[in-house]
Amino acid sequence: VYKRQIIYLSPRGRLLNYELSKSIAESNCNYILICGHYEGIDERIIEKYNVEEISIGDYVLTGGELASQVLCDSIIRLIPGAIDEGSLVEESHTNNLLEYPQYTKPDNFCGMVVPEILKSGNHEKIKEYRKQESIRITKKYRPDLLNNK
């Protein structure tokens, strides 16, 4: 039996993060998303139906439609079979670390080259390099994530 939960996308709601998306994706629940426009929705709806409020960040949008798309995308990708399971393991926020840098072709772009280790074929060394790069990137851009371990 499925239970039902109503979610209102609101700037005053609980901040959406990986853990919240994961718990929603793993729940045995049907969700109804409410998207306000301009001033929001009637407060009595929130009170009467025990509505959970979720925010996608500390800013205000004209309506909740874009926020609901962000919420849906963050949940759907965590549902088994939606994307390759191996892809989820190394993604940003999975272990409170941001993802390592990505490189594409050409090998040399404006004098900047792909690190040699990534072209070496040594999977163990590549794995270690990516882990160290994830730590470096997280320290640089989101050191707060390292304190949440």
Regions found by a protein language model. Give the residues of each.
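Internal, active-site/partner-interface "lid" segment
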Residues: 66, 78-116
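Short, small-residue-biased leader/transition segments that mark boundaries at the very start
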Residues: 1-2
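Short glycine-cluster motifs
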Residues: 18-23
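Short beta-strand segments
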Residues: 7-10, 33-35
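SAM-dependent methyltransferases
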Residues: 106-149
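Structured adenosyl-cofactor binding patch, chiefly the S-adenosyl-L-methionine
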Residues: 41, 45-91
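Short glycine-rich anion-binding loops that position phosphate/pyrophosphate groups of nucleotides
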Residues: 11-14, 37-39
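Loop/turn-to-beta-strand initiation segments
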Residues: 28-32
